Curated annotation (Swiss-Prot):
Membrane topology: Multi-pass membrane protein
Subunit description: Interacts with ced-9; interaction may be suppressed by interaction of ced-9 with egl-1.
Residue ranges the record marks as coiled coil: 51-71, 385-415
GO molecular function, one term: GTPase activity
Chain spans, region G3 motif: 211-214
Protein name (Swiss-Prot/TrEMBL): Transmembrane GTPase fzo-1
Record organism: Caenorhabditis elegans
Gene3D superfamilies hit by this protein: P-loop containing nucleotide triphosphate hydrolases
Amino acid sequence: MSGTASLVHTLPASGDSNHRGLHSLKNSRRAADNEPLLRFREAKKVLGDVYGELKDNVAELEGVYKDIKENDFVSSEQREEIEAIGDSIKTIMDTFQRDNMKVVFFGRTSNGKSTTINAMLHEKVLPQGMGHTTCCFLQVEGSEGEVGHLQLDDNPQKIDMKMLGKIGHALSDENSDLPAMGQDSLLKVFHPKKSESGECRLLQNDVVILDSPGVDLSPEFDSWIDKHCLDADVFVLVSNAESTLTQAEKNFFLRVAKKLSKPNVFILNNRWDASAAETENIEDVKKQHLTRFRQFLVDELEVCSEREVNDRIFFVSSREVLESRLKARGLVQKAYQAEGHGTRALEFQNFERHFEHCISRSAIHTKFEAHNRRAHEMIGKMRLNLNSVLTSAAEQRSKLQNNLNESTRTFNECRVNFTQFEKAYREQTEQLRAEVHLKVSADFFEEIARLDAIIDRFEQPFDGSSSGMTKYKEDLAIFVDKCLSSDLEARCTGGLMSRIWNLENDMFQYVTKILAEPYQNKLEEVWRYRAPFKFSICVDVPALVNDFHEDLEFRFTFGLHAIIRRIIAYRSGQPVTAINTNLLTPLSLKQQSEKNSVRDAEASAASEEQAMMTQMVLTSAAFLANGSLGVLVVGGIVYKAVGWRVIAVGGAAYAGLYAWERMRWNSGAKEQHLKEQFRSHLAARMQQVSTAHTHHCETQAIREMDQVFDGLKATVGGVHREMKNDLDVQKTQIDAVDSTIRTLGTIKGKAVFLLRNLEQFASSYLRSDSPPTP
């Protein structure tokens, strides 16, 4: 071994308490820097003492919480949190003592993994040599007993060490009656930390060494990694200097790199003693190996940098080192040594030195950094829990001691004032309903009067075809609907918004005044996120003009057909545009029935019956009016009554009016006539739905006020319940609070002291330069 690593077998003495052990760190650190393996045991001892004190503090706090009555200022969640912390500490302490430094050796079959392990242990612990092949995982760890033994992973029964060569040897003919060992099974080898041949420094310092089958025996590496490698601190790849790095070896470590974050990997190029026979190309071969190893560690695995990689690759002969160490101890007479063995021995010692520093630093960080962080978290949770309980206790005591009478008076006044507020609210809502009714009704009829101006703003090319006319009416209805809805919303919202807002604000201000100051924030939270009120108005013009039938054929104002349509519209109580324009044609009944096919059967039948009666009357009148006999009869009667001059003048005036209207009938007149018919029809329909519209707006305003009132009432109800509960608690718990506050303050001081110990532990063991790199 390296001369720079002096053997230290015992831990420095420490006191019973954790802080006394921490004070001794300054004296022991200088020795620990020279013996990195010792730092792991020191850190384990110090952190274990911290956890012991933390366990006592949590147990004391649990006892205090149990003495406090249920539903007091310690909630059930806070009790459960402390109990969970206590359970976590027990679990961590159970596993804490089993934490150790673990190194796993991998490589192809017969590359010298077992020989390398024996060389590091200074003793032939594992079977090795020609013809021996490890068939399973062999885990070597220290035993406090004087005699070593074997133990299967799933069986606690001890097995004699003499059976190791048979059980772990894949090629042995004498293990037919022994337990079958699969390649991923584990055989534990418990070797005495102090044996007759001396003390094993690695095993003395809690280093666990894992030997593996050859990676070329099975491509199923995932089960190997999951079972045996996830807790490893260092991986050592034992390669053969007489061959290059194989894909099987690469694949294994690529799998490891995927499952572990940046594993620590060393590469031992074993059997470098073979280079003694080939001195000519030895440097070229070494450079070739170095290049491939660097590329694998830096570029492919990405586990170290270019600067670090030189301390991860070593060219050694494990056989030479083992036999040399056995000879030094007098266990063999002659040691195998080839030319250059001294350089290779120094290289092996250099590997051991870097390995010990690496595994110590890695194990402390991987095993203890998480424990240290977890202890910080648990102490932090305990302190937050304590602070919360102490704050609640102090507030409770202050309220119970000084504000009991004041709280009772405030509670009673709040209840009386809210009852008065509820009565006033009912009166205000009825007044608001009347105001909304007047305002909305007036605005609605004003919009009806403005229909001419709204319709005149509609500009779209007029198409007299059937499809064009349908599209024109649909677009006109949509345009008018948007204008009416937006105008009515603006009128109603603008006129009534200030009134509604002022009323809501008055409600909020009144309720704020009747609540005590500590509870006013609850009301502000409800009020802050409330959206402003706005009327939602939908006139739905397309639905109102659904029965609109335009009449764009030229019809003389004083013609018989026009007069009859006006009479029918008056008698039926409908706009004249709701009367079909083709009443005088027999085909109109069929067309009307097809248009209204979506209506129910009864309405369709009634419409057909009415249309048939109208058809009969109008057809009879038309035949009578158009027949020559009718003309002669009527003409004779009029002639006898008024004379021919009056008839001539009347006929001329009638003909003149007819000619004047006929001359003015063009596309523009048709469009204007259509808009006028549309306006007249829509105005009549809007007057019919004005009452429903007004009621709808009233409902919206009252609903808005009810929502505000319900929110205020729910908030005040919650405040009343809290005030009542506070009064009940204040009457019974003053003395208990005083005693609890004193006890909790003592526990809190202990928690602060433990935090300082953890910070000192992190500074001594977990900082980036601890232990220093060799």
